[in-house]
Amino acid sequence: FNQDALLECARAGTLAFGENYAQEGCTKIDWFRTNHPELHLEWHFIGPLQANKSRMVAERFDWVQTVDRLRIAERLSAQRPDNLPPLNVLIEVNVDAEASKSGISPEELPALAAAVSKLPRLRLRGLMSIPAPAETYEGKMKPLLAMASLFKAFQEKYPQADTLSMGMSADLTEAVE
């Protein structure tokens, strides 16, 4: 969506927005902060993050939902300005082991979470996953339930974790269940 559409949404009460592309998101964030500083919007980066774009994301976004490598987490922490609160992050889990998707395997989660939780300018808030598309209710629910179970175990180790972000429009109803 362009800035005008987002402005209309913000005036209607939507205050959190997700962006897939770092440059496009940063342009929108800068525009809002310059032209509408009265709006206190929350910006989530939800796309794959390349190392060469980490600084712009660390300097502008409030959340990164796609942390899947320690190198990216370390860069985000090092590049987060001291005058901003710690960057909220979610670790992306590839629950269906899809070759075409980003994210770590559930087995890799403990090691990455332990390392991310120690980074000073990041706040580990939880997990994110985009399950494989499925036609049936059961097919949609299987990876969502696996993620819910993984998140429950994750919260035992990280009680501050309060966010589980899952699914897309096609499985929204099932993800909310």
Where are these predicted regions, by residue range?
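Acidic, divalent-metal-coordinating active-site segment for phosphoryl/phosphodiester hydrolysis
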Residues: 169-177
